[in-house]
Amino acid sequence: MLLENGWLVDARHVPSPHHDCRPEDEKPTLLVVHNISLPPGEFGGPWIDALFTGTIDPDAHPFFAEIAHLALSADCLIRRDGEVVQYVPFDKRAWHAGVSMYQGRERCNDFSIGIELEGTDTTPYTDAQYEKLVAVTQTLIGRYPAIADNITGHSDIAPERKTDPGPAFDWSRFHAMLTTSSDKEIT
């Protein structure tokens, strides 16, 4: 995958207003894996894009009334079919982590990139999602090498608030695919 000005060239771009600048001289050193489905447990549809762009209709579903006021975004979403949607360029600070801490450092949004997988904690993720997550991760490691040793779940940086990506996310599979992909890049 190619990067241009912080954007994945092959992703669908849906710019979110919910971001700002990282602190001065701060580069991404952490990748946070999340999940999202809107309405909860349902896949497809325009609702994730609408949430991350601040345009979700609070009357379209009872749950949306609870979240319509939120100003949040992820850097990217990987849909069930493997489509990659990017909301925030990687050099900017997306608002995905909330109150969080990683290895003693607070405010993970300052130094992380957030990737949402369309899914739930208990619904197995698709092959296409793992493949695209590996491809995006490899691209990010190429640009921000420190990420290679710092990939975690939202539940690990905000354990009292969050459970995603949940037990359905196969970390062993992801790491094996990432290692295999890295080996192919080298040879």
Curated annotation (Swiss-Prot):
Record keywords: Cytoplasm included?
yes
Q: Its GO CC terms?
A: cytoplasm
Q: Which residues form the active site?
A: E116 (proton acceptor)
**Binding of Zn(2+), residues:** H34, H154, D164
Domain (N-acetylmuramoyl-L-alanine amidase) spans 29-167
* Range of residues in the leader sequence: none
- Keywords from the named record: Cell wall biogenesis/degradation, Cytoplasm, Hydrolase, Metal-binding, Zinc
Q: Site described as Transition state stabilizer, positions?
A: K162
Q: Provide the cofactor list for this protein.
A: Zn(2+)
Q: Which GO terms describe its biological process?
A: cell wall organization; peptidoglycan catabolic process; peptidoglycan turnover
Membrane in keyword set: no
Q: State its Enzyme Commission number(s).
A: 3.5.1.28
* Pfam families xref list: Amidase_2 (PF01510)
What terms describe the molecular function in GO for this protein?
metal ion binding; N-acetylmuramoyl-L-alanine amidase activity
Function recorded in the entry: Involved in cell wall peptidoglycan recycling. Specifically cleaves the amide bond between the lactyl group of N-acetylmuramic acid and the alpha-amino group of the L-alanine in degradation products containing an anhydro N-acetylmuramyl moiety.
NCBIfam families xrefs: PRK11789.1
The record's similarity note reads: Belongs to the N-acetylmuramoyl-L-alanine amidase 2 family.
Q: What is this protein called?
A: 1,6-anhydro-N-acetylmuramyl-L-alanine amidase AmpD
The upper taxonomy is: Bacteria, Pseudomonadati, Pseudomonadota, Gammaproteobacteria, Enterobacterales
Identify the gene encoding this protein: ampD
